[in-house]
């Protein structure tokens, strides 16, 4: 198959990349005998000539080498793989024509630009238009091998070919429509994908295989275009027999007659096409003249635009002026407008800015349209010229190969040779023409300037706005049409109702009009005179009167003559008519009532006549005033005639009217009422069920999430004061206040005032931080006494705050008795716990036994430290008074020795609640640090003074708490090891619980407070503090809730001197409400996982990128980590939830991809979670709303099928399973046996799952691959209750048979389940009559869409 070439400067990237310098050399010398040619038709012809001649072509090939330097070969810098291409044109050209050999490739390539599309994505065809400008860049191939002389055998063959071509020409001309393609695929080296119907199927050869055999492998272009020709012509197919002799000096002679026949057929078609192309060539000069005229017109218009268009015009519309070869954008816009509107070039510079923008946008659009038209016209001209030149060459080649030297062909060839030489010469001319045409738009040259980009952007915006406008217009038209249709329907209904009412009205006036024969005329006259009154007062009365007027004249004409007989006869007819039109007569009565009321409103003069009207309808005697139509006529002397008329028809008409109306009203009301009720019931059932079932689950899940989050935050913040409502804001406010105090370096009075203002809760909010700590320190050991005065003690004692100080009542700095008694008790207890711990560690770990060699000496040192610390604190407590506590100087002097070591630890963690004031003070200079310590301690005196007396146990707790955290009074400093329960996520991984480590274990704490003080604590002292803290926390958890509330404050105040306030707050939360507050660690993705997720996010929409090596590594990492976290039996729901949140934060697409990852068996995390009964994880996965619930593993099972087999114990788990059923297809079949989830649940006796599946719409009658149903499975396994449940379903079919012809009844009998057989027998035989209607009943009474039966 000939190869398609592109002559533009850009080619496909792949081919361009492959063509390196070495390959260029190969393309320069591809025509030696030893080298494969790579172009099939050329080889075939060479083989054909060699077979006939049986000669040797080595000498001619040497001649090719000598002649090659004469061919113009520029630098191999052309970007595509076209540079060294020698198409198969030469093999079909005459062996004696040298002009075919000099530059055949370029002309043919020009024609190939317009060939059919190529499979490998080339650059757009617009970019290939300037191909005429690069003839010098083409490397022209050497001439094809030629014969030095014709022998007799060749001449005979060519003559025979000529004869057969002439014979078949008539046949070919019979169906000219089949050969409408402009070029042939295999003739003349065109390389197109022409699919000529009559030549498609000859020679069943594989194109890909042929490429490998015959294609030039060194060239990336040739193989890349093979897929573009799936339907090649027969010539190209037959030529594929020939690659065997492509590079052999002695060719293989295996040419078949079919091969020759194909060549003849191709040449016949080419000759026919040549004539068509000659006709097309004649139109080229005309088109060129048109182009020149258009270009001249363009230049004139551009000059006009330059004179008329102002520079500010473009600035308003936001588009810069663009420079084109034929003028700027604004000029071209105006040019297009001039062509369309006949030269309207005037621009109103005084228009509003908005209109200017719209005009400029429209001009840009018109400019683009003009550019496209010009481009299409030039493309058409160039294509026609290219086709003509190439086809001339093709036909010449055809003549030279197959026809020989007959006169007709020679004449044609001479003619075409001349045109072809003209084409060669005209290449330069075309180059100039192309340059002129290309100058219209730079985009045609492949150059995208910034101006073009802006134009494109505006064009896209215009197009999008057009589409929106179009859509809105369509919607508007549809809406308008619907409204008009609705109005027409309403008018039709109203007209119909009016017709009906008029008919009924016609009957009524017949009775009345007889009495008012003469009055009608008078009434007409009076209506005209009284129209003003009616219009001014009430508009409705006018309409009613007009209706009455129209009806009465008709009645008058009928009843003028015989009055009495007509009255009687009409009464009888009226009875029948009232039966029919009962409802309508009722409406008429209503209308008449409204008429009367309106008449009353019209004028006070006519009230007498109005009363007469009402009486006239109810009582016949008042028909004397029957001038109803003339209610206004009572003023005029027309009373005489109505009286006469009234005496005639009074009795009969009134009775008939009253009876008819009474009969009609009940019937109408009953019918309407029943209809309305039915409709209401139908709509109510459907809407209510749907809304309740669909919306309830969503709301509940949302509330649960929000509630848990808010509750944790609220409790954490509000523990100290008990003020739950003010907690959220006060927490953050306190921490801010701490920062302010730290920077201010102020004393006690100032910080407390700042606290009070910023917290927004009042003075008590900040002071409670101190008071809670003080109170709780004091209260921790004596629950009963301190709980009573809890509130008073909190608010009464204040440190450095004047408002709080005012509330103190008679402070008595008396120290409670028996402090040391309680202290000794707790010291002993601590010693015991330490000894027990060392003993256990030494027993369990032999390597630690040596480290614990002298436990008693260590205990003694620890004991001495505790006692010294506590005694110093005790002395301060005894000596300090409330006034001294408020005095910063006193605290600095008295407690300076105790503090000093705690500065670094206190100021590291910013406190949230009560600890914030203390932390703010402890971060001040050392002398103020002493005050922060002394403040809680000395305030103990003020606190118990209000209580009167404190129990020794309380004081002991206080001392112990102070001693635990003040044990660094000597040379060593203790680091606080208490960790936050939730783990500060931004800190360096604080532990979740307290560390319990042996004294000499050498454990290094990981608390977030890195010591900033000058002294550093030894690991031994750290461990000691750990050991002390752990049992104390255990002990306090055993106390009741009130004691916990106090002990929490007791710990907090002591910790404030040594630790961060954040730690104190979380201790309060932990101890005060341990059963409600849940504080846990947050699991975060590792750096490796984060990088993998980010890489997946960037390439998730690119299938090719997902298959790269790096992406496979990242996906393996994600899969391994995800299944490790989510798919194990021991998976942690909290961890899974954190991972899901992390994936969703990165990208919803990443979350969807990761959650639906499947392992080698096709199982996802949802499969594993259901199999392991980890229903909390199932809930998390379902809440993510990205799970593919219907995903089947390799065994064909979905998570719903696995859930049908799971064991569910808790009610909440069952709800999760039901939610899973509702999210997927409960009727999906397994790929292996075709079983559904209902069959699996029935087979394993899971009745709860059966109920859930049936509630979610599972079909009872689905059959698996063996024909079995769920009822058959239940009958076979003997599940009686399940059988009853299935039979109770609407539409359960007990007659179904499996592939063996067995029914559920026969299966139950074979298995020996007699009770089930009885049930089935009764259902099959006694429920036959009801079974057809059962599905309908189920459809009517179904409570909602999720509970419908299978046939609903």
Swiss-Prot record:
Keyword field: ANK repeat, Cell membrane, Cell projection, Coiled coil, Cytoplasm, Membrane, Nucleus, Phosphoprotein, Repeat, Transcription, Transcription regulation, Tumor suppressor
Effect the entry attributes to changing residue 1300 to A: 10-fold decrease in binding to KIF21A
UniProt effect for mutating residue 42 to A: Abolishes binding to TLN1 and impairs CMSC assembly at the focal adhesion rims leading to increased microtubule growth rate at the cell periphery
Short sequence motif named Nuclear export signal 1 (NES 1), residue ranges: 43-52
Phenotypic consequence of residue 41 to A: Abolishes binding to TLN1 and impairs CMSC assembly at the focal adhesion rims leading to increased microtubule growth rate at the cell periphery
Residue ranges annotated as motif Nuclear localization signal 1 (NLS 1): 65-68
Main subcellular localisation: cytoplasm
Coiled coil: 258-316, 361-395, 446-500
ANK repeat start-end pairs: 1109-1146, 1161-1191, 1195-1228, 1233-1262, 1266-1298, 1300-1329
The name this protein goes by in its record: KN motif and ankyrin repeat domain-containing protein 1
